[in-house]
From Swiss-Prot:
Pfam families: PapZ_C, RapZ-like_N. The lineage of its organism: Bacteria, Thermotogati, Thermotogota, Thermotogae, Thermotogales. This is Nucleotide-binding protein THA_1518. Belongs to the RapZ-like family. Keywords: ATP-binding, GTP-binding, Nucleotide-binding. GTP binds at residues 57-60. The keyword Nuclease does not apply. It comes from the Bacteria. Displays ATPase and GTPase activities.
Length: 279
């Protein structure tokens, strides 16, 4: 195991948002792991997973053992472990619960939200003492919290994934891509007898399209759009961008363009290339 992140802190302070970001960064994430299971489960998971993150909070039974658990983990995992504590002002937490219309998890123990927040602060005292990083989210929106965590955890961030999918419009649009680029306005190799049975990966098809007016310019245009988006995706802490390239049947033009883009982005990113409709 390379990295172990423990998220703890007040309900309404953003633990779910933080856990979601860590999942985007490639962590194996567990929400509200029972505290008595931490030292049992962790060795099993760490055998096959490099990056692990889980939430420990006041909902957990036997939370009074938090100091014992964290002390043991710090001894065992040392530099691999970071404990991040999320907090916020009472008024902010009250407003967030009102906005989401959710009940505070400790409200059943007391008779008001204010008392539930105070009780949770008391329960979390030991967890706060063992924390490596404390983030006050009172003045942070979810986007800003994501940026803060990316800044803190940048050194453990996984490589950005660019997923490129070629497809044929006649077989339906892909539903899981961020951008779709249409290449149907270029000549179709399907209507050239010697190229019909080949795919966009074939050298003769590639030569035909390379020599088609506007192809190189369009590749550069797509690249400019994708580069523009990539910078902003990375700044927001997102770790994946998906591109769909479509032609009529998904055999020639879309495959060629997808292969060209994959070749470009493999120099900087992890690339997953799929040709959905190639026969």
């Amino acid at each position: 195991m390379k990295n172990l992140i423990i998220l703890t802190g007040l309900s309404g302070a953003g633990k779910s948002t933080a856990l979601g970001l860590l999942e985007d960064m490639g962590f194996y994430c567990i929400d509200n792991l029972p505290i008595n299971l931490v030292e049992t489960i962790l060795p099993v998971i760490s055998m096959n997973v490099d990056n692990i993150a889980f939430v420990l909070d006041a909902r957990s039974e036997n939370f009074e053992r938090i100091d014992e658990i964290l002390n043991n983990l710090k001894k065992k995992y040392a530099s691999n472990l970071k404990v991040i504590f999320l907090t916020a002002k009472d008024a902010i937490i009250i407003n967030r619960f009102a906005h989401t219309r959710r009940n505070h998890p400790l409200l059943k123990r007391v008779n008001s939200l204010e008392k539930a927040i105070q009780l949770e602060r008391e329960i979390l005292t030991k967890a706060l003492e063992f924390s490596d990083i404390v983030i006050d989210t009172s003045n942070l929106n979810p986007h800003q919290l994501r940026e803060k965590l990316v800044e803190i955890l940048g050194s453990v961030k996984k490589k950005f994934l660019v997923r490129i999918l070629s497809f044929g419009f006649k077989y339906g649009l892909p539903l899981d891509v961020d951008f779709i680029f249409d290449v149907r306005f270029f000549p179709n190799p399907f209507y050239i007898k010697d190229l019909r049975e080949k795919s966009g990966r074939d050298e003769k098809v590639k030569e035909f399209l390379y020599n088609t007016q506007g192809v190189k310019e369009y590749i550069e245009m797509i690249k400019n759009v994708v580069d523009f988006a990539l910078k902003r995706y990375e700044n927001e802490g997102r770790m994946e961008l998906s591109i769909g390239i479509g032609c009529t049947g998904g055999q020639h033009r879309s495959v060629f363009f997808a292969e060209e883009l994959a070749s470009i982005y493999r120099q900087r990113y992890e690339v997953l290339l799929e040709h959905r409709d190639v026969k």
